[in-house]
Design a protein with these regions (language model features):
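Concave beta-strand-loop units of leucine-rich repeat
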Residues: 1-10, 17-30, 37-50, 57-69, ...
Length: 150
């Protein structure tokens, strides 16, 4: 179900059974607690989304540019997680089990030592990350435009 840029969409509580749901740029969406059963969920640029604690069961989750998102501790079970531009995110220690993780432009992220189990990790434009020595187990690592000590 694609509801891209549907500004009138506010209540998504009845959409928890949908397999693939695109709510990108639906700025009226705030409460996503009923969407934990969605397989593939795109909430990119949903400015009102803050609490993502119920989304740990989502397989593929796009939260890019959701600047209100701060606490991602419940998302360790997500397979593919996009946090591109989530500048409020600081603590990523619970995300070591994520298979593919994009933290590009997450300026608050400094400590990535718990992410050694991630298969594919993007840290592009993460100037706060200076030590990647614990990431030896990462298969694909993107450090473009990041000042790090390798």
């Amino acid at each position: 179900l694609n509801l891209y840029e549907c500004q009138g969409v506010v209540d998504v509580s009845a959409l928890g059974g949908v397999h693939t749901l695109k709510l990108s740029d639906c700025r009226g969406v705030v409460d996503v607690s009923a969407l934990g059963g969605v397989h593939t969920l795109d909430l990119s640029r949903c400015a009102g989304v803050v609490d993502v604690s119920a989304l740990g069961g989502v397989h593929t989750l796009n939260l890019s540019w959701c600047r209100g998102v701060v606490d991602v501790s419940a998302l360790g079970g997500v397979h593919t997680l996009n946090l591109f531009g989530c500048r409020g995110v600081v603590d990523v220690s619970a995300l070591g089990g994520v298979h593919t993780l994009d933290l590009s432009h997450c300026r608050g992220v400094v400590d990535v030592s718990a992410l050694g189990g991630v298969h594919t990790l993007r840290l592009s434009h993460c100037a706060g990350v200076v030590d990647v020595s614990a990431l030896g187990g990462v298969h694909t690592l993107d450090l473009s435009r990041a000042c790090v000590q390798v």
